[in-house]
Amino acid sequence: MKLIYIFSLVAVIAVTMIPGIMGEAEAEGRPPQIGIFDQIDKGMAAFMDLFKG
């Protein structure tokens, strides 16, 4: 039961926070930066650059 409560809380926080982050990023004309996802995106871009050309 506690796990369901924790997952529900995390889901509610994610649903309420992510649109705000996306809106701020759009207003400033930059890609959204959400902690670990931003780092993964940078890593994948660097990895793809290795095979470009």
Curated annotation (Swiss-Prot):
Function per UniProt: In vivo, this neurotoxin paralyzes about 70% of blowflies (L.caesar) one hour after intrathoracic injection, when tested at high doses (45 nmol/g).
Signal peptide: 1-23
Modified residues (Lysine amide): 52
Propeptide: 24-29
Keyword Secreted: yes
Annotated protein name in UniProt: U13-myrmicitoxin-Tb1a
Subcellular location: Secreted
Tissues and organs where the protein is expressed, per its UniProt entry: Expressed by the venom gland.
Assigned keywords, A-Z: Amidation, Neurotoxin, Secreted, Signal, Toxin
Record-level GO cellular component terms: extracellular region
Main location: secreted
GO molecular function: toxin activity
